[in-house]
Amino acid sequence: MSILRKIKGKVRSLFRRKKTTEPAAAYDIWASSYDRQKDNPIAYLNSLVFNDILDALDLEGKTIVDVGCGTGSNWDKILSKRPYKIIGYDVSSEMLGRLHQKYPQATTFLLHDNALNGSWDLSCDMVVSSLVVGYIKDLPAALAEWNRVLKRGGEIVITDFHPVALQGGGNRSFTHEEKVVYIKNYVHPLHKIKALANKMNWQEIDLIERKVDESIKFFFEEQHVLHVYEKEFGSPILYGWRFRKG
């Protein structure tokens, strides 16, 4: 399949609803090609937002918990900040396998029922979670578990598909063997996340909301679907959030 067709399928798939696959099974399928994707506007924007947030943080000597670490796509950036340790969690054993190919000494755990097994209470300085929140069914339980392992004064960094995009018919998907795989996900409005954060005394430091704009226009131009770009221009597509535990 040509790059053009892949991009075309990816952007169109963002606005269709189909039969969905559970995240663990979907990412087991995606693992073999996940690090090679060049046609994903969400991954592109997420990298920009995640890196912008991390650029403002001092991670030297700190313990970082990465919830939904996947293949470790953010680990080069995190490791460049010289943390003491990264502990990775993911629901997909295949994604963790790919991570260990890149980082053989990595500490990782297969994630079940949101439990951060292997991390003690108040033991970490930061929890990061990139493109994961929308896959979590029981978000209050998950955030409570993050709060359990996080030290007072520790920080939380979340990036994810914007709920407004999902409510508007957007999908989380990828192409495998010329077929689009749609991943089961849940819509968690930002006000709901903020209410949960307030309940745990997480103080908002920064909120970035990225919209369909000129920075991703080329994805639409390359597949000749500028009408989709024009229709969605200005619509929220991804957010990045930084909190500090009080």
Where are these regions (language model features)?
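Conserved class I S-adenosyl-L-methionine
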Residues: 2-58, 73-77, 95-98, 157-180, 184, 211, ...
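A short glycine-rich, Lys/Arg-flanked "PGG" loop and its adjoining helix->strand segment in the class I
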Residues: 140-152
